[in-house]
């Protein structure tokens, strides 16, 4: 079974985002082994750079040699859904690596985490709250699989 890992800073706190994320995670687990790693939010009393560094150290510590890190960042490469499915195909075909999507917290990702990335990807040129970004990523992963399988989810 193909494997996907998502590392995200902070638990989903808003009920509708939590419900939407669970909906797509349930769909994803039909086709993938999905590992979701939630990183504790950095100390809110810290300045943003220090908070990012704290969260970044936790993310880096969670990475494994099997993780092909894809950082989610507004400055990253943008894809159509078709392009995203094509981008994922070689990752899913590599038995030794799994795509590992990394979603930062309120202030994004630290430079240390960005330095570990094989790829940097943007969901849009717009900025999203990290809870929404997580749901959009889950939906796009599900859609990419539907495109590759030729199921009617993607029109």
From Swiss-Prot:
EC annotation from Swiss-Prot or TrEMBL: 2.1.1.177
Pfam families, per database record: SPOUT_MTase (PF02590)
Keywords (A to Z) from UniProt: Cytoplasm, Methyltransferase, rRNA processing, S-adenosyl-L-methionine, Transferase
UniProt-listed InterPro entries: Alpha/beta_knot_MTases, RlmH-like, tRNA_m1G_MTases_N
GO molecular function: rRNA (pseudouridine-N3-)-methyltransferase activity
Protein residues bound to S-adenosyl-L-methionine: 104, 123-128
Catalyzed reaction equations: pseudouridine(1915) in 23S rRNA + S-adenosyl-L-methionine = N(3)-methylpseudouridine(1915) in 23S rRNA + S-adenosyl-L-homocysteine + H(+)
Function: Specifically methylates the pseudouridine at position 1915 (m3Psi1915) in 23S rRNA.
Subunit structure: Homodimer.
Protein name, UniProt field: Ribosomal RNA large subunit methyltransferase H
């Amino acid at each position: 079974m193909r494997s996907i890992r998502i590392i995200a800073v902070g638990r989903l706190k808003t009920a509708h985002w939590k419900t939407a994320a669970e909906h797509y995670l349930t769909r994803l687990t039909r086709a993938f082994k999905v590992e979701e790693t939630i990183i504790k939010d950095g100390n809110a009393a810290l300045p943003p750079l220090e908070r990012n560094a704290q969260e970044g150290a936790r993310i880096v510590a969670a990475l494994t040699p099997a993780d092909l890190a894809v950082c989610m960042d507004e400055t990253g490469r943008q894809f159509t859904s078709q392009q995203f499915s094509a981008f994922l195909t070689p990752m899913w075909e590599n038995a030794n690596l799994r795509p590992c999507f990394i979603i930062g917290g309120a202030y994004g990702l630290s430079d240390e985490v960005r330095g570990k990335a094989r790829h940097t990807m943007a969901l849009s040129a717009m900025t999203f709250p990290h809870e929404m970004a997580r749901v959009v990523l889950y939906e796009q992963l599900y859609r990419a699989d539907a495109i590759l399988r030729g199921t009617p989810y993607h029109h």
